[in-house]
Every structure is written in structure tokens, then in C-alpha cells.
Amino acid sequence: MTERDREANEYVLGTHRVELLRLGFQHQVWAPFTSSLWQRAGFGPGQRILDLGCGPGYASFDLAHLVGDAGEVLAVDMSQRFVDHVQEQAECRGISNLRAEVQDVERLDVAAGSLDGAFARWVLCFTSDPAAVVAGAALALRPGGRLAIMDYCNYRGLIVAPHSPEIDTVISATFLSVTRRGGNMDVGQDIPAMMRSCGLEVQSVQPIVCAAQPGSALWRWPETFFLGYLTTLLEMELITEDEADGFRRVWT
């Protein structure tokens, strides 16, 4: 991908076709956890739900089926390319209760009290002002509406056994790279306080801890991210070529 192909509001790994496929695989891996979150939030038929930072819309499509024809999903993202993809796929799939818009989630433009629910997955960790995202979503919720968030809480808690310094180096560099971009890969620790400051009642906090075997889908999920992100870490001079090669050798 050339610089000319890049969007002004680029994702960490871009918005090109390879990233579409990676995000699709990611959604498949995490769909059971996501569906469980929606169930606990009470999302269901006839509701109006906001998908914050929808990306290419994989969760948005599932939400559209969940709320049914009597409901509606508003999917917002900073990427015009991803929003176009959502709209095209919705038309191809005959999904008429899904609307996608280009919006900055830190400056949400949704009518106050117009939503039954809002959802964000791995969005707040990449924003420079996650409290503004939470506040905007809270304002858009009707009384009794629910905000459901899935995000990282202890990113450097990702470990492999036996211990690998090569993998530790890349995990730490990834954490630092997001910090330099204004994000926080441990944002989950702060989300409950953000919610309370907006007048929301925190009803549930559920940690997700998983163990994966090499070759499994859950193992391949971080693999697809890290192997693609090594180039960015090299460009940011957060790792060396030898460290990148060491990660590839150990992980694969």
C-alpha cells in the first residue's frame, strides 16, 4: 500500500483488504464473548443500538440481526473506507436496519436520549480521550439504556510458556507504540470510573482470561496482529530487525 492509498484517519494496521480479512477473523474468534456481553447488556429485538468504532461492520451486522426489523443499528467509524464497506455489505446482504456514518467517536453526534444501547470493542484503547467517548455515548442513551464495552485491562499480561524474551520485547513495544499515538492499552482499568462520572451505574465487570494452544484460532488471533505490526514497530524504531526476526522465529 502506498502513502497515497492511506486514509487521513488510518487504523493501526490500515484499512486495506488484508486488514479487512484480519478483522473478520478476529470477530469470529471473539463472537461468543461478544454475544455474551450483549446478552448481559439486554440488547434485543426492537432496540436502537450504537456500534462505536464499527470498523468494517462485522459486529454491526450481528447487531442488526439481533435487533431485527423493528430495531436499528447506527454504526460509526472514523474511516470512510470502512463506512463505505459497511454500507455496501449491508446492501448486498439485504440488511435495511443498519446505517453507517463517518464520525469521530470522541465527538459523537447522536441525539441525546435516542439509544437503547451502545457498544464498543477495542476502541477506547486507541483513542486519546476515552472519557469523551464514554460521555458521548452516555448522553445518547435513554433512561435505562446500556453501554457495553470490551477492552484491554492488562495488555502486558499476555505471556507465553515457556517464557520468551523475544515475545516480551514485542508486546512491550506494542504497548509503547499505542501510548505514543495517544492511546492506552490498559484503559479497561479506568472505564468503570469514566462511566460513573457520567452518571452511569456500573452493573457488571467481567474479566476474560484465556489460554491458547499453538495452531488454535485463539493463538492465531494475536499472531495475525503481531506479524503484521512488526513493520510499524520497526518504522517507529521501537524494535530492531534482529528483535523482529527473533519474534518471528519464536512465535512461528
Predicted segment positions?
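N-terminal, positively charged/glycine-rich alpha-helical extensions of SAM-dependent methyltransferases
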Residues: 1-20
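Conserved catalytic/acceptor-binding region of the Class I
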Residues: 148-216
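Class I SAM-dependent methyltransferase SAM/SAH-binding core
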Residues: 50-52, 56-107
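C-terminal helical/coil "lid" or tail adjacent to the Rossmann-like core of SAM-dependent
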Residues: 12, 18-19, 30, 203-252
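A short SAM/SAH-binding and catalytic strip from SAM-dependent methyltransferases
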Residues: 116-130
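A short acidic, Gly/Pro-enriched loop at the edge of an enzyme's catalytic core
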Residues: 108-117
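Conserved alpha-helix/loop element of class I SAM-dependent methyltransferases that forms part
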Residues: 28-47, 62
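A short glycine-rich, Lys/Arg-flanked "PGG" loop and its adjoining helix->strand segment in the class I
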Residues: 131-146
